[in-house]
């Protein structure tokens, strides 16, 4: 049994579940120790498959109902629909290559992303029956991937002021120290730096609030601020519960954040 961190929306949503996996029992000497569903970060393939099978069984879905992209810090969004489901496995994998967000209205399909400090965002318009998930690292945030997801949801029939968004466990501002080139990227992308950047007085280093930056992107895209909630779990501070590349290194497991219509 995998312990799941339930992600709640600001308003009650019927028939939709959203969650992030936790690592479970951890061997501190092994950066992959615990529950990892990501198959392209160097973990043992059989361990990853076992974790996926366990989660699918726990959620009451088939293994091929777990859909996750091969993320590359892009701003590409894929729609998981009947046409996608009709593709063979190789065609599906090709369609998910270089994708960092998914949208679907299909019931019983668990869409999700894998993160280790980046911000996972789940979104829903329950009236339209549309759910989505995105992976927003600093590059995806600068590229406003959350806006791209909202726009795709609306193309599929969602109404922007009905959309609710919840951010899963991710790195907190205190832990997310960045170089000046990252600050400059946010500046060039016209983010309000006063809202998202602070300097550590002792080191002079910049720290960015990725959650606040993504909240700003969502609000600018038309999602009501009252409809956005953020997990307060920091992946780096709580690296024994959630994977953290900053703490464990890039060769480590990933936290899976998913959403589905029951």
UniProtKB/Swiss-Prot annotation:
Cu cation 1 binds at residues 73, 75, 118, 135. Pfam families: Cu-oxidase_4 (PF02578). GO terms for molecular function: adenosine deaminase activity; copper ion binding; oxidoreductase activity, acting on diphenols and related substances as donors, oxygen as acceptor; protein homodimerization activity; S-methyl-5-thioadenosine phosphorylase activity. Changing residue 237 to Q: Loss of 1.0 of Cu/mol of protein. Loss of catalytic activity. SUPFAM superfamilies: CNF1/YfiH-like putative cysteine hydrolases. Changing residue 75 to Q: Loss of 1.0 of Cu/mol of protein. No effect on secondary structure. Loss of catalytic activity. Its EC number is 3.5.4.4, 1.10.3.-, 2.4.2.1, 2.4.2.28. Binds 4 Cu cations per subunit. This is Adenosine deaminase RL5. It comes from Unknown prokaryotic organism. The gene is rl5.
């Amino acid at each position: 049994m995998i312990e799941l961190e339930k992600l709640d929306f600001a308003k009650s949503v019927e028939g939709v579940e959203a969650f992030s996996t936790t690592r479970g029992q951890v061997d501190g000497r092994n950066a992959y120790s615990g529950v990892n569903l990501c198959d392209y970060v160097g973990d043992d393939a059989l361990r990853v498959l076992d974790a996926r099978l366990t989660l699918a069984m726990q959620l009451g879905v088939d293994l091929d109902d777990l859909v996750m992209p091969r993320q590359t810090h892009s701003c590409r969004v894929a729609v998981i629909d009947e046409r996608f489901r009709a593709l063979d496995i190789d065609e599906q994998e090709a369609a998910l290559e270089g994708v960092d967000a998914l949208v679907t209205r299909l019931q019983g399909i668990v869409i999700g992303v894998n993160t280790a400090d980046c911000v996972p965002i789940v979104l829903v318009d329950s009236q339209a029956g549309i759910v989505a998930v995105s992976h927003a690292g600093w590059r995806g945030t600068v590229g406003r991937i959350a806006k791209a997801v909202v726009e795709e949801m609306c193309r599929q029939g969602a109404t922007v002021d009905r959309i609710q968004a919840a951010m899963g466990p991710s790195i907190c501002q205190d832990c997310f120290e960045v170089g000046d080139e990252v600050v400059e990227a946010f500046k060039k992308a016209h983010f309000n730096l006063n809202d998202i950047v602070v300097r550590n007085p002792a080191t002079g280093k910049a720290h960015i609030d990725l959650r606040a930056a993504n909240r700003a992107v969502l609000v600018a895209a038309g999602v009501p601020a009252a409809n956005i909630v953020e997990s307060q779990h920091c992946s780096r501070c709580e690296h024994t519960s959630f994977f953290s590349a900053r703490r464990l290194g890039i060769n480590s497991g990933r936290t899976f954040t998913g959403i589905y219509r029951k």
